[in-house]
């Protein structure tokens, strides 16, 4: 028969209390690790993201739902349930991931309401359009893969990497790098502009495009056989290049005030 002294009984009770609390918290964290919303129609799908300081991965797939996962998000403590921190977005966190998601027509808008830095992964239908807005200067990383529709980016200092996209891509940024690897070039114009930072574009070797490239204090480099600029224009390694690629095609405009522009063949 085991006998416990009063101090040991207190320690034993405390141990079980901690264990129960840990189990409860773990279950709570697992309960809301994923959020889903279905797009009502197969065409005209759009995802609008308003993010603040977090890193975001957008992955396209063959499906009709938006699936969101948050890595590193800590749920609101029980004592704070129903309360909202001052200075936080007035939108309500209805995903339990620090995000507010609303469906209007065939557009899902996701707004980050929590100021905490989290890594979010969003799976979105492959033919959905993406509109991404960075709302603060906290800076994160943005990665987009396999989307076959318009990508619109309004960035402050996030580094953005787009892989296996068709666009068109319309991006404006203050600082940070923008890297795009095109699977093909859409017929609509693509335009990327920066104040400070590099623009790195990869195209299939046979891509037809009409280029307009300009940098104020950087260089333009390429491994494509671009025709030399007309007399009086800057040389290829200089500040401005305009002309056809492989005979011409959709307009591809790349502008940066302070940074380099790279136009390379997809390997």
Task: Report each predicted region and the residues it spans.
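Hydrophobic lipid-interacting interfaces of membrane-associated proteins
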Residues: 73, 140-142, 158, 176, ...
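Bacterial N-terminal signal peptides
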Residues: 13-24
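Tandem repeat domain/solenoid detector
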Residues: 159, 163, 168, 177, ...
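Acidic (Asp/Glu) and glycine-rich low-complexity loops/linkers
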Residues: 27-50, 55-137, 143-148, 152-154, ...
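Positively charged n-region of N-terminal signal peptides that target proteins for export
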Residues: 1-15
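Short helix-loop boundary/capping segments
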Residues: 161-163, 169-173, 181-193, 207
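Beta-strand-rich extracellular passenger or scaffold domains
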Residues: 130-133, 141-142, 178-180, 200-202, ...
